Every structure is written in structure tokens, then in C-alpha cells.
């Protein structure tokens, strides 16, 4: 019998619990308390050590002064008993030891002068002087020249009482200081984090109500700059939502018209095919089918344009080296297939730039389609690309159509905008909007002029300024050490001179620049 064994899976780990964290206000307040507490403790230790050393040093000085006074007075040699008894009226204990003869003592009530090893060493002449603390007394022992030894001690109880009071004072003052630091830290933190609270409230308000009102900015500190950045984000979000709403509204309006017409035609075709229904003439059937196909193509074009716009807005763009000459050639092939009655006069300089190949191809194709659409049968469309300087080239697409009225030029490249004369022509109203978006995204500029100023018809010319670098002639090898990728990356300089910096950037009533939010109504 064959047994099947299933591999045992390792036991699943329980998910880690989110550890509760303190709020920023509490963390700042605790940090302030900790810093103040550390400083208070260090200062308390320093004060305690300094005062303690000073008090004990003062006791040593007092004992030293008493011993020197007794020795200098000569009373220890003349009448040692009386001299020692005289110290009983002070606050010290005294003892005079004469080895082999006598010991004189005078002690305070309830106190006994302790004699230990250091004092015995002084008495035996092994040490000249000793100081030490024994119990609650400070002892000084001095060996005199006549062989006697003087021992003096003083009680440390008054000093210890002072030190105990000092400890309590430092403890109370330190505690009060930490408490004051906590309160002050809380107040400062609350005032300092008020802009953060406003930002939090604004973010929650946006999430709840989609209210994108800016937040008031106070001061010029880091939090004020953070608030300004947040307001900038709110403005960008508001503009994005406005563009999105406008795009949806315009797209719905533009889609409704061909869909309604398509639905009507399809219903008419279906009704004519029902049993017993009168048959439409063959010519009308052909026209209806042609209308349906044209409307489907119009819908496909509109959807494709919308996809291109949303693709750019979503940032789904891959940048790579792009040969603009090749882009223009491929676009011309497509336009020639649709308008084989148009003559294209082409003069293109080899040029390479780093960007979105699909977007650039769509922009060039839209310009050529636009020029071909407005050119009369047998007309000429000019396509030239000439180098202006080592890092810029100008692409010019010109036609000899009816031209654009000056009052409509500022509407060029607006989404879904179509002039009165253009509404009868095929198109979605998005082609030039895509051109504008692609050109600006690649650091370029665009302007519109009459092909023949004052002519009848004046025609229209689009001037597109693009960054990049020239390509070597065909058959010319790339210099050693420089790859094609290096050449392409050198063409990414986004710095583009203003229209007046080029020889063809004339400022006149017939020139509309993209930078001035112009638009072409076609």
C-alpha cells in the first residue's frame, strides 16, 4: 500500500500586536521632564558634595586652630591639667597624653573621645598628625615636641543635621523643578503642536467631507513651512479633482452625442430587418452602415485620446532615447494613408531626445493630422525641423488652411474645445490637448502663428521647441567612450529658453505661446 505524505507546514506566527505608543505631546513633555530631572539630580549632587566638603573642612580648621592655640599659649607645658580642663567649656573634647606619666582629659557631657590606631600611632611618635572621623566625631591628633600628644575631637551631629536639612531642601526644590518643567513642557508642546493639530484636523476634514480649504499659516518657522506645503498639496489636489471632474463631464458630453447617433442608426437598421417591416432602399442601407462605422471610429478615437490623457496624468510613462526623425517619418506614413491628396514638404534635421516615445509620436501625429485635416485637396503641408542651438531644435508644422481667428487662439489645446467652424469636422477636441501636455512634459514650448500673415487664407503654423541633441550623420560612428545612452541622457536638460530667446520667437498679435495658456481652436 502506498502512503501519501503531506509535508508539514510550519506553524503560522501570530501577528505582532501593535504596541501602543505615546502621543508626540506626551513624548516631548516626558523628554523635557527627563532632561530637567537629570540636570536637577546632577546639580543636587554637586551642591551637596560642595557644601559637605566645606562643612567638614571648616571642622578640621576649627580643630587645627584650637590645637595651635593651646600649643602656642604654653599652658600645656606649664599646667597641662588646667589647660585641658579649660576646653570643657567649649564644644570640643580634649586629651593630653604623656606616655609613662599622665593622661589629662576634658569631655563634653555624654561624649567620649575615641582613641584608635591612628591616635595610638601619633602617641607612640610614629605619626606627627592624624585626622579621621570616628562615629559622630571628627578627631585630630598632634604629636608635640616634648613627647606628649594632644587629641581634640568635635561632634558632627550639628553638621549632619545641616546636611539632612540640605538633602530635604534639594529634594523638594528638585521635585518642584521637575513638576514645573513638566507643566511648562506641556504648555510649550501644546502651543508648538497647535499647527500640527490643525494639519491633522484638516486632513481628517478632507477625508470626511472633501473640503479642500487651505489652513491659515502663522509665523515663519518649520511648522509654518509645513503648513504651507500642506496647503500646496491641498491646492494641487483641488486642481486635480477639478480637472478630473471637468474631464469626466466633458467626456460624458462628447460620448453622448456619437452614442445617441449610433443608437439611432442601429435601431433603424434593426427595425428595417424585422419581419413585415418595410425595407430601406439599398442606398440608405449603405449610408447607415457607413454612418455606424464612422461613429464607431469616432468613439474609438475619443476613447484612445482619453486613455492617452489619463496615462500621462497617472505617470505611466517610460522615458527612453527617441529619434525624432524616425518619429516624424512614421507619423507621415500614417497621415499619407489617410490623406493621399496632400503634398508634404519635409526638411528634417537628425535629432535625438530622451522622453516618452509613444507620447511624442502621438503629439507629432496629431499635429500632422490637424494640418492635413484643414488643408484643401491638393494642398501643401510643411514639416521642418531645424536646430537652433546645440541643445534645442524647432519643429514647424504649417498648413494653408483657413487659419485661426485671433480671439480663439487662447483656447488652443483646451480639452474638448472645438470652434464653431470645427464642429462639423471629424475629431474629438483632444488632439491638440495631447500635444500641449506632451510638449510641456518634455520641457518644450509651443507657439502658433499664421503661415502667411495677412494672406487669404492665412493658414496656421505650429512651432514646437524641444530639447535634445543632434544625431551624427548616417554612417558616422559614435565617438569612443561615449555610448548612445550617454548621448540620450545628455538630451534631458529641461532648461528651455523663453520664446524670445530664439530667432523665431517673435512677439506679435499673431503669436500665441503655450506658456500664456493659449489654445488653438480647430
UniProtKB/Swiss-Prot annotation:
All ranges on the Cytoplasmic side of the membrane: 1-30, 189-522
Family annotation (Pfam families): HAMP, HATPase_c, HisKA
InterPro entries on file: 2C_sensor_his_kinase, HAMP_dom, HATPase_C_sf, His_kinase_dom, HisK_dim/P_dom, HisK_dim/P_sf, Sig_transdc_His_kin-like_C
Positions of region (Disordered): 467-522
UniProt cross-references to Gene3D superfamilies, sorted A to Z: 1.10.287.130, 6.10.340.10, Histidine kinase-like ATPase, C-terminal domain
Keyword vocabulary terms for this entry: ATP-binding, Cell membrane, Hydrolase, Kinase, Magnesium, Manganese, Membrane, Nucleotide-binding, Phosphoprotein, Protein phosphatase, Stress response, Transferase, Transmembrane, Transmembrane helix, Two-component regulatory system, Virulence
Entry GO MF terms: ATP binding; phosphoprotein phosphatase activity; phosphorelay sensor kinase activity
Recorded GO CC terms: plasma membrane
Catalytic activity field: ATP + protein L-histidine = ADP + protein N-phospho-L-histidine
Sequence ranges of Polar residues compositional bias: 502-522
SMART domains, per the entry: HAMP, HATPase_c, HisKA
Residue ranges crossing the lipid bilayer per the database entry: 31-51, 168-188
Modified residues (Phosphohistidine): 253
Residue intervals annotated with topology Extracellular: 52-167
Membrane topology: Multi-pass membrane protein
Principal place of residence: membrane
Localization, UniProt: Cell membrane
The HAMP domain, residue ranges: 190-242
UniProt domain Histidine kinase: residue ranges: 250-470
Keyword Kinase assigned: yes
Task of the protein: Member of the two-component regulatory system MprB/MprA which contributes to maintaining a balance among several systems involved in stress resistance and is required for establishment and maintenance of persistent infection in the host. In response to environmental signals MprB acts both as a membrane-associated protein kinase that undergoes autophosphorylation and subsequently transfers the phosphate to MprA, and a protein phosphatase that dephosphorylates phospho-MprA.
Protein name: Signal transduction histidine-protein kinase/phosphatase MprB
Organism: Mycolicibacterium paratuberculosis (strain ATCC BAA-968 / K-10) (Mycobacterium paratuberculosis)
Designated gene of the protein: mprB
Amino acid at each position: 500500500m502506498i502512503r501519501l505524505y503531506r509535508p508539514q507546514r510550519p506553524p503560522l506566527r501570530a501577528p505582532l500586536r501593535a504596541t501602543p505608543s505615546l502621543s508626540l505631546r506626551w513624548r516631548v513633555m516626558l523628554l523635557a521632564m527627563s532632561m530637567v530631572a537629570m540636570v536637577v539630580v546632577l546639580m543636587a549632587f554637586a551642591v551637596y558634595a560642595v557644601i559637605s566638603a566645606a562643612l567638614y573642612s571648616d571642622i578640621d580648621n576649627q580643630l587645627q586652630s584650637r590645637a595651635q592655640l593651646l600649643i602656642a599659649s604654653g599652658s600645656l607645658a606649664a599646667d597641662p591639667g588646667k589647660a585641658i580642663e579649660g576646653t570643657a567649656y567649649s564644644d570640643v573634647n580634649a586629651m593630653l597624653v604623656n606616655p609613662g606619666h599622665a593622661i589629662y582629659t576634658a569631655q563634653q557631657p555624654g561624649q567620649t573621645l575615641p582613641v584608635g590606631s591612628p591616635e595610638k600611632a601619633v602617641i607612640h611618635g610614629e605619626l606627627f598628625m592624624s585626622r579621621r572621623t570616628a562615629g559622630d566625631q571628627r578627631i585630630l591628633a598632634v604629636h608635640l615636641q616634648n613627647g606628649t600628644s594632644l587629641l581634640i575631637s568635635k561632634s558632627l551631629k550639628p553638621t549632619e543635621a545641616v546636611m539632612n536639612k540640605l538633602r530635604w531642601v534639594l529634594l523638594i526644590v528638585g521635585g518642584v523643578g521637575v513638576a514645573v518643567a513638566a507643566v511648562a513642557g506641556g504648555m510649550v508642546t501644546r502651543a508648538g503642536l497647535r499647527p500640527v493639530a490643525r494639519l491633522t484636523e484638516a486632513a481628517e476634514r478632507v477625508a470626511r467631507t472633501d473640503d479642500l480649504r487651505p489652513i491659515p499659516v502663522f509665523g515663519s518657522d518649520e511648522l509654518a513651512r509645513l503648513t504651507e506645503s500642506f496647503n500646496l498639496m491641498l491646492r494641487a489636489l483641488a486642481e486635480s479633482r477639478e480637472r478630473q471632474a471637468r474631464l469626466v463631464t466633458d467626456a460624458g458630453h462628447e460620448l453622448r452625442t456619437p452614442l445617441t447617433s449610433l443608437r439611432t442608426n442601429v435601431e433603424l437598421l434593426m427595425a428595417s430587418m424585422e419581419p413585415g417591416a418595410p425595407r430601406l432602399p439599398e442606398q440608405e442601407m449603405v449610408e447607415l452602415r457607413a454612418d455606424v462605422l464612422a461613429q464607431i471610429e469616432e468613439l474609438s478615437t475619443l476613447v484612445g485620446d482619453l486613455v492617452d490623457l489619463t496615462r500621462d496624468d497617472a505617470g505611466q510613462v517610460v522615458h527612453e532615447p527617441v529619434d525624432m526623425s524616425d518619429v516624424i517619418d512614421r507619423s507621415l506614413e500614417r497621415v499619407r494613408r489617410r490623406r493621399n491628396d496632400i503634398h508634404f514638404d519635409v526638411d528634417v534635421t537628425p535629432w535625438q531626445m530622451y522622453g516618452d516615445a509613444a507620447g511624442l509620436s502621438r503629439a507629432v501625429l496629431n499635429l500632422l493630422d490637424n494640418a492635413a485635416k484643414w488643408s484643401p485637396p491638393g494642398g501643401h503641408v510643411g514639416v521642418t525641423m531645424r536646430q537652433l542651438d546645440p541643445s534645442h531644435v524647432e519643429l514647424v508644422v504649417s498648413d494653408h488652411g483657413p487659419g485661426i481667428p485671433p480671439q480663439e487662439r487662447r483656447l488652443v489645446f483646451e480639452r474638448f474645445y472645438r470652434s464653431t467652424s470645427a464642429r462639423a469636422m471629424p475629431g474629438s477636441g483632444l488632439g491638440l490637448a495631447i500635444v500641449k501636455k506632451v510638449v510641456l512634459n518634455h520641457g518644450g514650448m509651443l507657439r502658433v502663428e499664421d503661415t502667411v500673415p495677412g494672406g487669404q487664407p492665412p493658414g496656421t503654423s505650429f512651432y514646437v521647441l524641444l530639447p535634445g541633441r543632434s544625431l551624427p550623420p548616417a554612417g558616422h560612428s559614435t565617438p569612443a567612450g561615449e555610448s548612445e545612452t550617454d548621448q540620450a541622457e545628455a538630451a534631458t536638460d529641461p532648461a528651455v529658453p523663453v520664446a524670445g530667446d530664439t530667432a523665431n520667437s517673435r512677439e506679435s498679435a499673431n503669436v500665441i505661446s503655450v506658456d500664456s495658456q493659449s489654445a488653438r481652436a480647430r
